[in-house]
């Protein structure tokens, strides 16, 4: 069977490889000179630039592609877990190191507003519920049937998907700095924390589940 995949971002490459593993003859079409989509690397005036995202939040999805061809990922790529994920620096000079170290996170939160430590814990628990529904159950399900989408409405309402990410975070967190820190995740996918649906808050828990990695 012949198949054509348009776009060589992570999704396009993954689709092409999965089809190839099923013995399809695959043509991968890309308008840029290099593969990778937003994850491509390009050079200009002697400098090397990342075309988009620079970190990996669910490395097992990449490992799966190598396993389809009985290849060992470590023979081709090096993926390093990061200790500090993001460093936030505010206009007043205050900095916050965001990481998967819960003790460090809570200590930093306590220094800003001790009452928000409990709110942070509750926020993480709530984003786990969003993750369970939005990622674990639905990430690989095609949304091509209106009735199926209608059945999701009660669950989405229960998860407060009508709120923005910032609004959801604000319902748990009172300090403005912490609100901005904990609602930044839509920026990673080109969204606005003040308008993007709170379903994207699942990224907060996704990072805690698998960590953040950098590919060398």
Predicted regions and their residues:
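Rossmann-like flavin
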Residues: 91-197
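Helical element adjacent to the flavin cofactor pocket in flavoenzyme catalytic cores
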Residues: 202-216
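Active-site-adjacent bridging/hinge elements
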Residues: 29-32, 197-203
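A short glycine/serine-rich beta->alpha loop
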Residues: 44-48, 188-190, 211-214
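N-terminal glycine-rich phosphate/pyrophosphate-binding loop and immediately adjacent elements
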Residues: 1-129
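Conserved aromatic-histidine-acidic binding/catalytic patches
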Residues: 7, 153, 157, 215-216
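Generic alpha-helical structural context detector
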Residues: 67, 183, 201-204
């Amino acid at each position: 069977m012949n198949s054509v995949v348009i776009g060589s971002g992570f999704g396009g490459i993954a689709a092409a490889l999965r089809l190839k593993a099923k013995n399809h003859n695959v043509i991968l079409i890309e308008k840029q000179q290099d593969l990778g989509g937003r994850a491509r690397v390009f050079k200009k005036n002697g400098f090397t630039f990342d075309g988009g995202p620079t970190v990996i939040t669910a490395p097992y999805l990449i490992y799966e592609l190598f396993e389809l061809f009985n290849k060992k990922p470590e023979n081709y790529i090096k993926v390093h877990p990061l200790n500090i994920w993001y460093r936030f620096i505010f206009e007043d000079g205050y900095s916050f190191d965001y990481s998967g170290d819960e003790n460090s996170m809570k200590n930093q939160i306590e220094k800003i507003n001790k009452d928000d430590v409990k709110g942070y814990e509750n926020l993480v628990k709530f984003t786990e519920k969003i993750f369970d529904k939005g990622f674990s159950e639905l990430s690989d399900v095609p949304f091509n049937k209106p009735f199926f989408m209608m059945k999701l409405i009660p669950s989405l309402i229960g998860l407060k998907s009508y709120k923005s990410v910032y609004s959801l975070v604000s319902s748990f967190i009172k300090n403005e700095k912490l609100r901005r820190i904990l609602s930044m995740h839509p920026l990673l996918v080109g969204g606005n924390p003040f308008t993007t649906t709170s379903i994207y808050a699942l990224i907060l828990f996704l990072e805690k589940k698998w960590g953040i990695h950098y590919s060398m």
